[in-house]
Curated annotation (Swiss-Prot):
Active-site residues (renumbered): D52 (nucleophile)
Described purpose of this protein according to its UniProt entry: Formation of pseudouridine at positions 38, 39 and 40 in the anticodon stem and loop of transfer RNAs.
Subunit annotation: Homodimer.
The protein's name in its UniProt record: tRNA pseudouridine synthase A
Matching PANTHER family: PSEUDOURIDYLATE SYNTHASE, TRNA PSEUDOURIDINE SYNTHASE-LIKE 1
Gene3D superfamilies: Pseudouridine synthase I, catalytic domain, C-terminal subdomain (3.30.70.660), Pseudouridine synthase I, catalytic domain, N-terminal subdomain (3.30.70.580)
Organism expressing this protein natively: Thermus thermophilus (strain ATCC 27634 / DSM 579 / HB8)
EC numbers: 5.4.99.12
Length: 253
């Protein structure tokens, strides 16, 4: 038995989320686990985290256990023949037998895409959030700086039973001029995130960018952990899971 780390890219538009669910809902985990026996693997895949319906991923890590002797370099091609068009394996490697995709992650990173132009884009309607009005990027960057470090982020999250304290290692804004127009990209990196935290932060930052609230208003949200003080949850389709990092010793068989 070998344990493999798979990196999966997916378009979340037609998925009911990452995590396997009942009632016949289509999920990323469900589709991957359905394909695994086709390469001689056990039908169980453990992800680095979970994404909601409509959220995309560039390289979501999963660990799986393989009983067959299939060479690891052939795993992506073999699995991709069995997977749907909106879910593909883009990398595979053998890892330590006790490697755990969720528990061993040192950090995880997300990106949120915002298209800023006068008219919506049919091509990016499932890939980026459209905003008609120009954004005050300087104010957004000031607000982003307040989020860095260790705080109670419950004020940005969905209903949570877990403690809200998390450490945000990196929070930055990038601007790109793409074919569709000006794109603002928000990047967040931390060891772990609360459910809905990233989209809650984005929704609040958008209010800052649109002049609906001052940057310093985020201080009260972090201090009180009151969700009512934050902005709305940003739509799922602009969010991407980018990557996760692991200790080198866990990545060696």
């Amino acid at each position: 038995m070998r344990r493999l780390l798979l990196l999966c890219e997916y378009d979340g538009t037609l998925f009911a989320g990452l995590q396997r669910q009942g009632r016949g809902l289509r999920t990323v985990q469900g589709e991957l686990e359905r394909a695994l026996p086709g390469i001689g693997a056990l039908p169980k895949a453990v992800a680095a985290g979970r994404t909601d319906a409509g959220v995309h991923a560039l390289a979501m890590p999963f660990h799986v256990d393989v009983e067959s002797a299939i060479p690891v370099e052939k795993v992506p091609e073999a699995l991709n023949r069995l997977l749907p068009e909106d879910l593909k394996v883009v990398g595979a490697r053998e890892v330590a037998p006790d490697f755990h995709a969720r528990k061993d992650a040192l950090w995880r990173a997300y990106r949120y895409r915002i298209l800023v132009r006068p008219h919506p884009s049919p091509l990016l309607r499932h890939r980026a959030l459209w905003v008609r009005r120009p954004l005050d990027l300087e104010a957004m960057e000031e607000a982003l700086s307040l989020l860095l470090g260790r705080h109670n982020f419950l004020g940005f999250a969905k209903e949570e039973t877990r403690p809200g304290e998390r450490e945000l290692l990196e929070a930055r804004l990038q601007v790109a001029e793409g074919e569709a127009g000006l794109e603002v990209r928000l990047y967040f990196r931390g060891k772990s995130f609360l459910r809905g935290q990233v989209r809650g932060m984005v929704g609040t930052l958008l209010e800052v960018g649109l002049g609906k609230r001052p940057p310093e208003s985020l201080k009260a949200i972090l201090k009180t952990a009151d969700r009512r003080l934050a902005g709305p949850t940003a739509p799922a389709h602009g969010l991407y899971f980018v990557e996760a990092a692991y200790p080198e010793e866990k990545l060696s068989p």
